[in-house]
Amino acid sequence: QGEMGEIVIKGHNIMKGYYKKPEATAEAMRNGWFHSGDIGKFDEDGFLYITDRVKDMIIRGGFNVYPREIEEVMVTHPAVSLAAVVGVPDERHGEEVKAYVILKPGQAVTEDELIDWCKGCMAAYKYPRAIEFRDALPMTATGKILKRELR
């Protein structure tokens, strides 16, 4: 309860595998457990909240960094309209935290100002070390950010 982890499911009603995809099946189905790829946590009332995706999680110097958590903080900055956080390769830490940001119309903030602001809102291992400002982010037809195109 309260700790985030991968959601795994077991039962007679769980799929037997992916159609004609044995590698994907072997990756998802381990010892009878279906590994969903979703990260979640239970609240004190027993409700399960999906908080992120395993493949989006950043491992920075041994610490797990959940991009959605950082994105939710960044969009509370008065100048930020939208943020997408990804892990980028880093020799020292394995992965480093990078944010792509769209500013609100008429707003301005520098990379250093936004990084300093983030430092005051989150743990030292979580804040973005690099921020790239963009006019738009790659998205699906349903409005989901295509993070694979940002990595």
Question: What residue ranges belong to the model's regions?
Answer:
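General small-molecule cofactor/ligand-binding pocket signal
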Residues: 131-134
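FAD-site-proximal beta/loop scaffold in flavoenzymes
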Residues: 32
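Active-site glycine/GP-rich loop and adjacent strand/helix microenvironment
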Residues: 1, 17-20
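AMP-binding/adenylate-forming catalytic core of the ANL superfamily
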Residues: 6, 11-12, 16-17, 24-27, ...
